[in-house]
Amino acid sequence: ALSIMQLEEKGMIDLDAPISQYIPEFTNKNQSKKVTVRHLLSHAGGFFPLPRILVGNVAESLGLDEEKDGDFAYNDAVAQEGVKLVAERLDAQTKENGLNGQPGEYLSYCNDGFGLLSDIIRRYGGEPSYADYLVKHVLKPLGMERSFCDFVRPSKDENAATLYKKVDGVMRGSRDYHDNAFVLNGGGAMKSTLHDLKKY
C-alpha cells in the first residue's frame, strides 16, 4: 500500500483509474463498474477470497529452478505468468459467480487484489521487480534490514519461524516457504521481525 501511494504521489498512477489501465491482462469485462486501484487498496474490489496460486507451481510450469534461475521473488517470467493467471482467474470468477458486491460496496479480503497492486509497482516503479522496489524505496530508507520478500532466504535463516501444518492428522514443521507462497509478492510474501515492524 505504501509503495502504491509513493507512485501516486509522484503522479505515476491514479488511485481512481481502473486496474485494467495498468494491467491490461485484467479485462474487468464481466463487471458493470470498473475496479480501481483504490478499490484494491481497501479490499473492496468485489472479489471473493480465493486459494493462493503458488509460486512453486508457476515456476515449475515454466521449467524454472531456483538453484539455477535465482530467487523467484526477483524473476520476471514468474511475475508475468503470475499476473496473467491472477487476472484470468478474477475475470473468470466474476463471470461464474458474480461479485461479492459492486466494487467499493463491501470489504472482502482477497490476496489477489494486493497481488495485482504489486504488479503495478513492478511495471511502473522503475525497478526490475516488486521486491527490488520494496527494498530500495521502503525497507532501506526505513532501516528495515531484516525484512524482505525473498522465498529462499528465510529457509536458510536460523531465526526465521518454522511453518506448521497438519498432514495426515499430524502437525508437521517445515522451513519450505514455497509451500504456501502466493505467486505475486504483494499478496503475502513479506517477511519481517517485530523490531523492523516498529520502524514502519
Regions found by a protein language model. Name each.
Residues N30-Y200:
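Short, surface-exposed loop or secondary-structure junction motifs
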Residues L2, A17-I19, A44, L134:
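Glycine-rich, histidine-containing beta strand-loop boundary motifs that form or position
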Residues A1-D16, F114-R122, L197:
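Active-site SXXK
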